[in-house]
């Protein structure tokens, strides 16, 4: 099962598959001293973050507000039902 295939099916190892050499491929590179990977990062990132927060704020704030209201209501209701007055009302 393991190992390289033998006979007519073996083409060669990775990078040396036995095919014709590639021609006509031109690559360009830029010196690391000429690159500016962080150019404009702080200027554009803060504006982009502010824009995204403003556009997506309602999609997050409204469900969060509803969930917080339900949480507060449940907590208050639980405290009431575990008080003397609450237990007295439940028994009736």
UniProtKB/Swiss-Prot annotation:
Disulfide links within the chain: none
Domain of life: Eukaryota
Any single GO BP term: mitochondrial electron transport, ubiquinol to cytochrome c
UniProt-listed Pfam families: UcrQ (PF02939)
Bilayer topology term: Single-pass membrane protein
InterPro entries according to UniProt: Cyt_bc1_su8, Cyt_bc1_su8_sf
Keywords: Electron transport, Membrane, Mitochondrion, Mitochondrion inner membrane, Respiratory chain, Transmembrane, Transmembrane helix, Transport
Membrane topology (Mitochondrial intermembrane): 82-92
Main location: mitochondrion
Segments passing through the bilayer: 51-81
Protein location: Mitochondrion inner membrane
A cellular component annotation (GO) from this entry: mitochondrial inner membrane
Residue intervals annotated with topology Mitochondrial matrix: 1-50
Coiled-coil zones: none
Family affiliation: Belongs to the UQCRQ/QCR8 family.
Quaternary organization: Component of the ubiquinol-cytochrome c oxidoreductase (cytochrome b-c1 complex, complex III, CIII), a multisubunit enzyme composed of 3 respiratory subunits cytochrome b, cytochrome c1 and Rieske protein, 2 core protein subunits, and additional low-molecular weight protein subunits. The complex exists as an obligatory dimer and forms supercomplexes (SCs) in the inner mitochondrial membrane with cytochrome c oxidase (complex IV, CIV).
Function: Component of the ubiquinol-cytochrome c oxidoreductase, a multisubunit transmembrane complex that is part of the mitochondrial electron transport chain which drives oxidative phosphorylation.
This protein's name: Cytochrome b-c1 complex subunit 8
The gene coding this protein: qcr8
């Amino acid at each position: 099962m393991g190992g390289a295939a033998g006979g007519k099916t073996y083409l060669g190892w990775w990078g040396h598959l036995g095919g014709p050499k590639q021609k006509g491929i031109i690559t360009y590179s830029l010196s690391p001293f000429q690159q500016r990977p962080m150019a404009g990062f702080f200027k554009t990132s803060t504006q982009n973050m502010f824009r995204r927060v403003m556009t997506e704020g309602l999609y997050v704030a409204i469900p969060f507000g509803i969930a917080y209201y339900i949480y507060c209501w449940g907590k208050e209701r639980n405290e009431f039902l575990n008080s003397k007055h609450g237990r007295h009302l439940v028994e009736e």
